[in-house]
Amino acid sequence: MRWALARSPGGTGDMARSLKKDETAIDQWVAGDGAPTFRQAQKLAKLLRVPFGYLFLEEPPDEEVPIPDFRRHPTSTNPSLDLRDVISDVLRKQDWYREHRVERDEEPIEFVGRFTSGSDIRVVADDIRSTLDFETAVRPESPADAFLRAFVAQVEAAGVLVMRNGVVRQATNRALRVEEFRGFSIADPMAPVVFVNNADSNAAQVFTLAHELAHIWIGQGGISDADVTIGGEGSGDIEEFCNEVAGELLLPWAAMSERWRQRTGGFEDWTSVIARELHVSTVMVARQLWQHEAIDRQQFFDFYEHEKQNWTSKQSTSTGGNYYLSAPIRNSRRLTQSVLESVEASETSIREASRLLGVKPANLTKLEESMGVG
């Protein structure tokens, strides 16, 4: 029971309120000084989202995460129930899409695992750029949210499913915490996937997407911090490598260094200008300067701490807006279209499509119309 409570997003207080008991009673159950009734145990198992029998195990079950965990942040812990459920949901969708492609005799995607974490950073970034037809020069013409959408569209056009959500499926009461993870990837050549925690700001999501693409390109998917403070240590760590590739993709040093040499204002003003133009964070700009020794480590971390103090909450767990526009964002537009086309071809049942996309069967037709399918 202690294990089940520890992995639950709520604490003892939440359980006590749901069961209409005092917290001391819950504490006694955990300590073995008392026991819930059969009905209370059933309700407790449902609240904690565990099989009923798990509450009475002497040892916690071994719950392996099905994808590698590359997180390095000091606060990183065992993946929460929310993160585990998101990974399971994404793997279910990825499995359907993989089978869908295999049945059509489609070829594996060549760039998945094309490089290794020992490859040249600039070469990997350039390959991603050319594969996606990613052109940084067009960014000043677009607002930040439009650039993020365009970036996602480019990635999906290349064959990678991109799913963005800030909650577990459609459960708005189960918000995903940026402090726990920013994204993860599945580097399957038949069905590569990137999941981005869109509880984060647009600029942070851009970096996370670029970071996860680096994981795809080296064939090592997993859970990521996508923390811009990781780097500059030359450790050969995968997260550090992917950060450096993301930095070079979004802020190519050859062009950035020239502007740095020609700057007229101060360091902080300059980073703000570049960040606004290219839809990245100011800390991301400063990180590139630190990475290429234009500023030292102390300057970078002083700036980072200063920016942290000034951050207002840019995070949002809202899934509001147009229901039919948000569904392809959560599920990947490419996957959504494939599922709907499969339904039209009588290859996938309406029930299965509804389960995969988290859309009521009665709303699938409207979703088709909104996407121009059929």
Task: Pin down the residues of each PLM region.
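Active-site hotspot residues in diverse enzymes, especially metal/ion-binding acidic/histidine motifs
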Residues: M1-G374
